[in-house]
Amino acid sequence: IASYNERFRNIQNVVLDAMQTLPYFCYLIPVLMFFGGGIVSAVLATVIYSIPPIIRLTSLGLTQVSGSYSEVSRSFGGTLLQTLGKVKFPLAVPSLVIGFNQTVILAFAMQIVTPLIGGKGLGLEVFNGLARSDTGRGLAAGIAIVLLAVIIDRITLAWTKKQRIALGLISKNK
């Protein structure tokens, strides 16, 4: 909707700006109040915290697709949904992948604090290491989180580069 309606895009940007400026602890309080502690609360807080980049970059990617592509699709009888699904989304893939990349990185960052409301996984290991002054345990789990984030980052960036080359947005030498 934001790629077609400037007023909606402006409202969306204000909401996303507010969401991205709030510290991640602010997401824990309402989730804890409404859903109590546990894994569901941790997942919900992680999703809410990490979703703004993919929304913003999806909107940006769809907005940056030249209007001539939509016009060609419409001239061949394409509906709005067909234009979105078969023309605009494929051309916006690099931006979508970067949004996915940023969302994953923020989700990993949130894993460090989700044990405060009942989250499990490597974040709990970091938290337990800090709580028990077990530096090795906390450091090992923290390094594992960082390595996972870096691996996913490199995979998505390499895939994005291939997509940009396939779309002719960059040359193979870059």
Predicted segments — roles?
Residues M33, A107-L148, R164-N173:
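Glycine-rich helix-loop "coupling/hinge" segments at transmembrane-helix boundaries
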Residues R7-N10, I39-V40, S70, L81, ...:
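Residues that define the loop-to-transmembrane-helix transition and helix capping
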Residues I11, P53-L96, V126:
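Short cytoplasmic-facing helical segments at TM-TM junctions of multi-pass membrane proteins
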Residues L44, I48, L80-T114, G136, ...:
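Transmembrane alpha-helices
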